[in-house]
Amino acid sequence: MAWRSCFMKWTQINSINASSLCPKSTRLNIHPQQRCGFRKTERPSESKKGVQETEAEAGGHNRAVPPKPVPPLPPRRPHQLFRPLVFTVGFTGCSFGAAAILQYESVKSRVQLAIEEAKEEKRDTLLEGHDTTYWHNWWNQLSNFQKQVILLISAVDDFWSGLSEGQKTVTGIIALNTVVLCCWRVPAMQRFLVKYFTSNPASKTRCLPMVLSSFSHYSVIHMVVNMYVLWTFSSSIVSLLGREQFLALYLSGGVISTFVSYVFKTATGRLGPSLGASGSIMTVLAAVCTKIPEAKLGIVLLPVISFSAGNALKALVALDIAGLVLGWRFFDHAAHLGGALFGVWYIGYGHELIWRKREPLIKFWHELRNMSPGRPGPGGGGG
């Protein structure tokens, strides 16, 4: 009996040692995600799913590591889109209203300036000989450094004068985007920029970033590509709409495209921040391609390839639709698509519904200016 008890004891010890090795290798092979942030839990609380056969052999002394839980989708709150919707409608209306007033004031100022320049031209003709002698003597009294500075300023002025009105307008937009890009490199400002210069439907601040995010780029390449496209189409869009109407379309396109992005993110539960001028630029690009569909476009690095503006717009819209359907997340395809559709709608219907019916607003503004005592307009009078 003694030899029998010794044999049973030796068999039991070997069985326990062999079974204690199995769950360790099973946990490392089946559940490597344990290294991704979960703390070690006690062995009795481990799941049964991965090692049911091992439990039968080990008598329940060892269990598998629980699988990583799937994070729940963020809650969908459509009621949070009400304020962005009201802001979008109000901002768009105010943008085109302000553009109509600015265009009215600009025309008055240009007319008055042309009259004054005609008077000065007659006066300068009489004093031309005296002025030439005076400026010649003044130039000879300058040092070489002063002359170089004046020549540099003159070259910059000549370059600026050679730009089209659209390029001059876009230069200001590029400058604003460059300033914001530099601010992103300042660590102390990043929290402020994330709050106000990135659009996110899950954020507490949802309305103001709909405008400011259109002037925000974190990547240099992202900004350079967007600003190059905007520069390319600036002359065409401003010649078609005018400077003031272009600015209203650009700003409104940014807000509307952001709102479309809000709707898509809320509907799908894929909440996250976005930034960039792509929505506004897609509005401008779509407006030009809709107005001049036969225009020829090309690729910078492939000048041999050319295609019509209408086909280019169709390809871009199809690409964004594919991005939405397939769930691509590298770009905000919802914002791109929203901006493009707004540009197409404005050229087809919006220009007639909004811009051509601005006369009552202009008349009201004209009467309001004339009612202000002692406040002459840019041209000096109220008429």
Curated annotation (Swiss-Prot):
A Gene Ontology BP annotation from the UniProt entry: signal peptide processing
Cellular localisation: Mitochondrion inner membrane
Gene behind the chain: parla
Principal location class: mitochondrion
EC number: 3.4.21.105
InterPro entries, per the entry: Peptidase_S54_rhomboid_dom, Rhomboid-like_sf, Rhomboid_protease_S54
Keywords assigned by UniProt, alphabetized: Hydrolase, Membrane, Mitochondrion, Mitochondrion inner membrane, Protease, Serine protease, Transit peptide, Transmembrane, Transmembrane helix
SUPFAM superfamilies listed in its UniProt record: Rhomboid-like
Biased composition (Basic and acidic residues): 39-52
Name of the protein in question: Presenilin-associated rhomboid-like protein A, mitochondrial
Positions in the Mitochondrial intermembrane compartment: 105-168, 241-245, 293-298, 356-383
Residue stretch of the organelle transit peptide: 1-37
GO molecular function: serine-type endopeptidase activity
Pfam family, any one: Rhomboid
Membrane topology designation: Multi-pass membrane protein
GO cellular component: mitochondrial inner membrane
Bilayer-spanning residue ranges: 84-104, 169-189, 220-240, 246-266, 272-292, 299-319, 335-355
Family of the protein in this entry: Belongs to the peptidase S54 family.
Reaction it catalyzes: Cleaves type-1 transmembrane domains using a catalytic dyad composed of serine and histidine that are contributed by different transmembrane domains
Active site: S278, H336
Top EC class for this record: hydrolase
Mitochondrial matrix side: 38-83, 190-219, 267-271, 320-334
Entry function: Required for the control of apoptosis during postnatal growth. Essential for proteolytic processing of an antiapoptotic form of opa1 which prevents the release of mitochondrial cytochrome c in response to intrinsic apoptotic signals.
Comp. bias intervals (Pro residues): 66-75
Domain of life the protein comes from: Eukaryota
